[in-house]
């Protein structure tokens, strides 16, 4: 259920590590439609204990216009060439600027006929992912790959 399952997750700078909880978001449904062979898709959202405590209450003060820096992180686990593998990608930036870059790039793809399918689909089904990420990088929104060693030195 949404709000359970606390986990410390690392996001790209300047956001860094955040406590995250399962979130009742539509993203897993859209992703499952695009990738039906995937066994489990979950969504998590960063929140402080105060955020979780006050979530059901009405807001007494308006939130910030944009909310400050934001980040997204995608972790994919599975087998590649018979070996268990984990790939973690992320991006950070001002949420409104990032959303505008994604929307503008998607519209550009539609207008130039670069979309893979027609009709009502999610973005993951519409575009070729690597080429889309390259176009986003051209607009200043770059994906980052988390690399590291699991062993502690």
Over which residues does each language-model region extend?
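C-terminal catalytic/substrate-binding lobe primarily of soluble NAD(P)-dependent oxidoreductases
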Residues: 1-153
